[in-house]
A protein has these predicted regions:
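A short linear-motif detector with a strong N-terminal bias
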Residues: 10-14, 25-28, 55-56, 77-81, ...
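Short, solvent-exposed loop/turn segments at secondary-structure junctions
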Residues: 5-7, 17, 39-41, 53-54, ...
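Conserved double-stranded beta-helix
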Residues: 1-47, 59-77, 82, 87-161
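Active-site-proximal flexible loops/turns
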Residues: 20-22, 44, 57, 86, ...
Length: 161
């Protein structure tokens, strides 16, 4: 994510809102945000509403907003049910770069379909552990397999590894 100078704030949202589960609920998604640049109020430090993951319904997510000011290299981790969003970048020249990684429970469908979004040649260059982290694995003997096979073994066999 790279909000540039003059970027509007992102609307407050929850990253697990697309799962039809009553609230509050057990954590479904863990969000991580790694700051590549300093996060300041001026360049749009991420906004979070502490405790909002415990709400049964939206109350007023614009109350009690915490701004995650942090130094480059810092990591912010939060429950995907927490209301959050990127702040407005009111600077004239600063880009606020970050790497955002979301992890959901293994039995839930991920938000992005990386199986077709990442070229197979790129996947082939990844270590097996990273391939499994992307989702080339089974949850148990029934969920996530391909023709009753482990997806990583299936993928590797198709590419003669």
């Amino acid at each position: 994510m790279c909000p540039g100078p003059g970027s509007d704030s992102q609307g407050l949202h929850q990253d697990d809102a697309h799962y039809p589960v009553p609230r509050p609920h057990q954590p479904l998604v863990a969000n991580t945000l790694i700051a590549l640049d300093d996060f300041t109020l001026e360049n749009g430090a991420t906004m979070l509403v502490p405790g909002s993951h415990k709400w049964a319904k939206e109350i007023n997510p614009h109350e009690d907003i915490f701004r995650a000011e942090m130094s480059a290299g810092s990591m912010l981790i939060w429950d995907g049910a927490v209301w959050h969003g990127g702040g407005e970048n009111s600077t004239k020249s600063q880009i606020r770069r970050s790497i955002n990684l979301n992890f959901n429970l293994s039995w839930l469908r991920q938000q992005e379909n990386q199986y077709i979004g990442i070229d197979s040649n790129v996947v082939l260059g990844m270590p097996p552990l990273l391939r499994r982290l992307l989702g080339y694995n089974r949850v148990n003997h029934l969920c996530g397999g391909v023709d009753y096979q482990d997806p990583l073994e299936y993928f590797e066999a198709r590419h003669n590894l």
